[in-house]
Each structure stands twice: as C-alpha cells, then as structure tokens.
Amino acid sequence: TTIYEFLGKRFGPRSRDAGTGFFMLTRLLASGVRLAGCAIALSVVFDIPLNSAIVLIAVVAFIYTTLGGIKAVIWTDALQFFLLLSGAIVTLFFIWSSMPGGFGEFFQIGSEFGKFKIFHVSASLSHPEFFLNFNNPNALAAGLLFGCFTTFAVLGTDQDLVQRMLTCDHVKKGQRALLWTAALNFPITLLFLGVGAALFAYYKVAPDAAVDGFIAAHHTDYIFPHFIKTVLTPGLRGLLIAALLAAAMSSLDSALNALSSTFYIDIYKRYIRPETTEKHAVTISRYSVIIFAAVLAIVAMQCGKTESVLWLGFTIFGYTYGAMIGVFLIAVLTDRRGNDIANVVIMVTSVLVVLFLTADSIGPLQGIRSTILSPLGIEQVSWKWSIIIGSVWTFGIGVIFSERK
C-alpha cells in the first residue's frame, strides 16, 4: 500500500495522481542529490571518476533492493545506521586527540569562528532577525518553521519514510517509531554538525592546500572524504570508508523500493493492468527498480556538477513538499470534501508561487517580483520559506475551493 491511496479515498483519483506525481518527482531529484553526495565521497577516497562511483552505488543498491524488497531495506539500513554513527563518533574523537590542545582547542576555534552559534540574532528581542526576516535564511522563524515543516513532510507525506511505518503490524508500533525518530533526530544532527566543526578546527591548526582549493571552488563536499583519505590511519580509514558505503546504500535502497511500490500500486495497477498475478507484480516491480536506478544515476551525474549538493537537496524539498503538506493537511485536519481537480491545480500553482518568490533568477518576471516585494522591505524571499509558503498556499486556497462533506 502507499500513502497516496488515502488522498484518492479522501478526495478522488486526480488528487491521488497528483500526490503520486509530486512524490516521484521529488524523490527522483532528492535521492539523485543524495546519490551524488555519497558518490563524491567515494570518488575522492578511491580516486575513481565521479560517474563510475555513481554507477557502482546504483548497481549495488539495485541488486539487494530487488532481491530482498522492503525487508532487506529496513534491516540493512538499521545496520548501516549504526555503522555510520560509529564512523562519526570515531572521527570526532580522532580529531580532538590529533589537535595539540585537544578538545579545548577545538572548542576555542569553533567559538571564535561562530561554529557553535545557533541563532543569528542581536541582543534585542525586537531585532527583526530574532524572529521574522524573509531575506535572511538564518532568522529564527525561518529555521524553526523550515525544520518543522520539512520533518512533517518527510515523515507524513513521503512514501520513502512512510513505507517503513506501514510495515508495522500495529498502529502503536508505527507511532513509537515516529517518536523515536523525533527523539533521535536532534542529537544525530548535532553529531554530524560537530564533525563539520571539528574538520574546520582541524584544518585551522593543520592547513592543507587541497582543502583551501576546495573552499575556493565552493566544493566543500570534497573536504571530509579528502580528510579520510589523507589523514586517518589505515584501520580508521577502513571504518570510515565502510560508513561512507553505508550512507550511500541507505540513501538509495529505500528510495528505489518506495518508487517501485508507488509506481506499481498507484500507476501500473490502476491504469495499465488492474488484474494481475503476484508473480507478474514482482516482475514489474523489479523492472521498475532497474529503471529508477538508472534515472537516479542520471540525475546524480547532473547534480554532481553543482557547487554544493547539500543546499541543492534542501532547495528541491522546498519547491514540492509544501504542496504535498497542504493537501494532506486539508485531508486530515478539516471536514471538507475537497475538490479533486482543484487540488491538482492548487498544488501546481503552489510550486509556481514558490518559484516566483524564492528562485534566484526568474527572467522577465524579476521586475514584477521587485515591485511586489520591495514595499515590504524584501529583496528576495529566502529559500527556507519555500516549503512554508507552499504549504500555506495549498492549504488556504484548497480550503476555499472545497465543500463540507
């Protein structure tokens, strides 16, 4: 089953189609970005071409996803998670022990350069950056709301994550899994931010010309794999390489499984062959995994050419997740029947509105945007507001055009 069947039962087939389409587009782009990020690390560590690393990861993930299905995805991801976590912890302690002043020097450098600064605010609570500033992505409201909305989208509207909850044999187990996810999300994020801060401090103490070159070229994604390759001892290097491989596999296998199941249930079974055998269903699912793995590899090859794959991934989420959040909120929080066709139109216009307000370049529409935003003191709406704007637009307009049940 998929979560988009709920939209079909709640509103109608077109809303289900829109949810399916938005998910598949978002997941192909976002997972392509993830694949590119992992492949960059492997290409640096093993000194192989980026495209070769992308193909290698895609092939391996395809093989065990095809053979094992969602069960293989969940168990391998669990093992890979602990491996990745161990790699991050080991990296932190290695860097601290390698610095002449140890942890104290790391903390001093991090504090001096603002690496531990959570909020970019002034001492005055009335300062606009403390809460609301549409120009600044570091404003408090932008950060808090972006985090909340993104978490809701990932855990509530994305089949990639929801499929794991759907494997639970009881609702309470699924709810417990969500609570554990929420509880662990913050400390794990802090851990990996700590690794980034530790790398920054390490290269302040031990400058490296190659790292300076990565920074100058805005290729900061290459710094950590360069550190693994040139600084770590052989044993630790092996552990971190295994952790990188774990990250690469876990970022791709669940996406392939989600895309395959969504394609079969929401598209193939409805429009191509409604009546089919279980053997045929398995065959189609496996063929679709091959196709999606190839598409993800192509997307990753294009994403690998960008300056920073991390920010590209965040930007992609913002454009489409807002529309998905909005339509699911109408379905869950209101007693409105909804307008099936109107939902599709509103979701599409949500993406257009977000692009108009947040895109770096919108061609001839640039002047119109300036005319609208300049009186409000806004030059260009920060990318962190994109998912929020999309959600509010879809929910607000959707409620207006819906009827009570």
Locate the predicted segments by residue:
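Membrane-embedded helix-loop-helix hairpins and adjacent transmembrane boundary segments
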Residues: 1-405
